[in-house]
């Protein structure tokens, strides 16, 4: 019987289209081969495995869409989709280079399991899958010093209104220190800059009581301070969905996927640890959503955080991640 905490329910139950909200889940790991991982996932969800190159597998049969298992290395994936006939010098050279790169990458590049957008109540199925993968030998960030593996959530927005988006940003920025402490991010991931915190100047701008920009200004401000995917809460997929040309003019990165979701990148993947699952990161994320839902409490938190950031002595004496707990307790 699992001793993990239950996955708490949503506050915002429906998406911007009025349907049940969905979420995409991405989990990085090592310790298993592409085919081994694909077969375990396929068996768990009763799916069919299709080969999509030497380093990618598509798992078909889920009404929500295709699951994907892939090596998280774009160059190798592109090479893996090319047929090697071996009847020319260039084919042989490419094959040799690919083999060398594959051998080197296996030491540091994770496999990634990517779900389709699934309804939130199916997260329990993902939690059960994590337990199976752990038993099968999957390894996460703390299993090897060089592992810098993450788990990412892509929850659909309950509304695409600019004010709602700003509320999510305000809530996340106010709770970032608390979330980061709770997540206990591995030093290797911190060094790699995959989940850099937001610049202090941007934080101060967003949490100001009069910061309620329209969509164009919101996106422009974000791009001015954050022209990168490497943020704990990456807004670029959502902003590309809303205004592709505006985003690509500043952050033209092929890895920015256009989708009406937030992209929460902070948590480590500690798959392989028996007590680990998606429950803690999910339940902590819901504190952001609860704060978004409660506008009056959000205003109070923003005001308190502004005061804290404006006083160096306060920052020296106290830690914001401890002070903000008082506001979280109001919802208990």
What residue spans do the PLM features occupy?
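Active-site palm subdomain of RNA-directed nucleic acid polymerases
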Residues: 135-144
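C-terminal accessory/tail domains of diverse enzymes
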Residues: 2-111, 117-128, 135, 160, ...
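Catalytic palm subdomain of template-directed nucleic-acid polymerases
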Residues: 156-158
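Short, conserved phosphate-binding/catalytic loop or strand-edge motifs used
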Residues: 145-152
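Structured core elements
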Residues: 152-154, 263
């Amino acid at each position: 019987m699992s001793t993990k905490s239950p996955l708490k329910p949503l506050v915002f139950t429906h998406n911007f289209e009025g349907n049940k909200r969905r979420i995409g889940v991405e989990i990085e790991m090592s310790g298993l081969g592409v085919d081994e991982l694909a077969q375990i996932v396929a068996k768990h969800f009763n799916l069919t495995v299709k080969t999509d190159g030497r380093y990618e597998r598509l798992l078909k049969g889920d009404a929500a869409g295709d699951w994907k298992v892939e090596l998280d290395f774009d160059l190798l994936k592109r090479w893996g989709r090319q047929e090697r006939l071996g009847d020319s010098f260039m084919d042989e050279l490419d094959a040799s280079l690919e083999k060398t790169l594959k051998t080197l990458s296996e030491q540091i590049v994770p496999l990634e399991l990517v779900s389709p957008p699934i309804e939130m109540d199916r997260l329990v199925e993902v939690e059960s899958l994590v337990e199976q993968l752990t038993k099968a030998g999957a390894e996460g960030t703390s299993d090897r010093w060089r592992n810098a593996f993450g788990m990412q959530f892509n929850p659909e927005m309950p509304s695409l209104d600019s004010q709602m988006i700003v509320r999510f940003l305000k809530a996340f920025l106010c709770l970032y220190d608390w979330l980061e402490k709770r997540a206990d991010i591995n030093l290797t991931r911190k060094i790699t800059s995959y989940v850099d915190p937001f610049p202090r100047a941007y934080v101060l701008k967003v949490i100001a009581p009069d910061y309620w920009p329209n969509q164009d200004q919101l996106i422009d401000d974000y791009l001015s301070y954050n022209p990168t995917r490497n943020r704990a809460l990456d807004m670029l997929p959502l902003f590309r969905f809303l205004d592709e040309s505006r985003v690509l003019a500043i952050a033209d990165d092929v890895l920015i996927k256009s989708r009406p979701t937030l992209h929460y990148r902070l948590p480590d993947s500690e798959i392989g640890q028996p007590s680990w699952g998606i429950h803690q990161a999910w339940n902590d994320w819901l504190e952001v959503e609860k704060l978004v839902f409660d506008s009056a409490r959000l205003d109070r938190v923003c005001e308190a955080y502004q005061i804290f950031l404006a006083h160096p002595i306060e920052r020296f004496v106290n830690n914001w991640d401890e002070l903000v707990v008082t506001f979280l307790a109001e919802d208990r």
